[in-house]
Amino acid sequence: MSSKANPPQPVATAPKRSQIPILDSTMSYVEAGASGPTVLFLHGNPTSSHIWRNIIPHVAPFGRCIAPDLIGYGQSGKPDIDYRFFDHVRYLDAFLDALDIRDVLLVAQDWGTALAFHLAARRPQRVLGLAFMEFIRPFERWEDFHQRPQAREMFKALRTPGVGEKLVLEDNVFVEKVLPASVLRAMSDDEMDVYRAPFPTPQSRKPVLRLPREMPIEGQPADVAAISAHDHRALRLSTYPKLLFAGDPGALIGPQAAREFAAGLKNCSFINLGPGAHYLQEDHADAIGRAIASWLPEVVLANQTDELA
């Protein structure tokens, strides 16, 4: 490690949960760390900031870690909205403004990556770096969407009017079946109860149903597909440091395809975590946390160099 990197010094505070008014609702978030760059952790569906619980302790000594519960998820409010991707953009933007978060290192998975890509495309000067895994992108064909045919059939059902409502709103299948099936280790009852808690009723599960229907597959929905394509063009042109994690066989992307994807980006490192499916944070928290903590000095140095250029 170069002495010129001036890496952040280990200073951390214990994680603290806070609630803040955002637009017509509230958003809950976990914060840890006291100095260094701001590291923003963005989760996906149907999880919450809880999924970062074993990763943040590795990173907090080196940066200010903030992990929000997206609107409608975790302990955040559940306003009467459609919970489209663009709703999440609106609430996340307001959240960042409310906390006066400017320059960030983004860490994201699942729909958190779509939000991270969109933020980076619109405000590249605010992005210090991006670590991501199991990411959203435009899928030209259903065959491109998932590593497992059974999962493709499940998502087709979730996108079918009436069928999706039965599966998610009534049976809570995304939390009870999809989530644990996408983690290799056995989830404990206590762990599952945390993920169940935000969704006790059919009405509370609206956000969980909406996002599978927002997935840009075969050009639909058209507005999300167009934005995702735009954001990925911006991602390919960007020069900020990137770190892509993959598991084997993965879910949205396998390790070989992920390696090739990373090679097509500028300034992107790749880490194969080994056996893993979709929720890699639940199977490889320590490895992910250590890798991000080790990568932070590189991000700091890259941004210092840019400032001097």
From Swiss-Prot:
Catalytic center residues: D110, E134, H278
Source taxon at top rank: Bacteria
Catalytic activity line of the entry: 1-haloalkane + H2O = a halide anion + a primary alcohol + H(+)
Enzyme Commission code(s) on record: 3.8.1.5
UniProt-listed SUPFAM superfamilies: alpha/beta-Hydrolases
InterPro entries: AB_hydrolase_1, AB_hydrolase_fold, AB_hydrolase_sf, Epox_hydrolase-like, Haloalkane_dehalogenase_2
Hydrolase listed as a keyword: yes
One of the record's GO molecular function terms: haloalkane dehalogenase activity
Keywords recorded for this protein, A-Z: Hydrolase
Enzyme superclass (EC): hydrolase
GO CC terms of this entry: membrane
Keyword DNA-binding: no
A Pfam family that the UniProt record links to this protein: Abhydrolase_1
Gene3D superfamilies for this protein: alpha/beta hydrolase (3.40.50.1820)
Every AB hydrolase-1 domain range: 37-148
Family from the record: Belongs to the haloalkane dehalogenase family. Type 2 subfamily.
Subunit structure: Monomer.
Function (record text): Catalyzes hydrolytic cleavage of carbon-halogen bonds in halogenated aliphatic compounds, leading to the formation of the corresponding primary alcohols, halide ions and protons.
UniProt name for this protein: Haloalkane dehalogenase
Organism: Mesorhizobium japonicum (strain LMG 29417 / CECT 9101 / MAFF 303099)
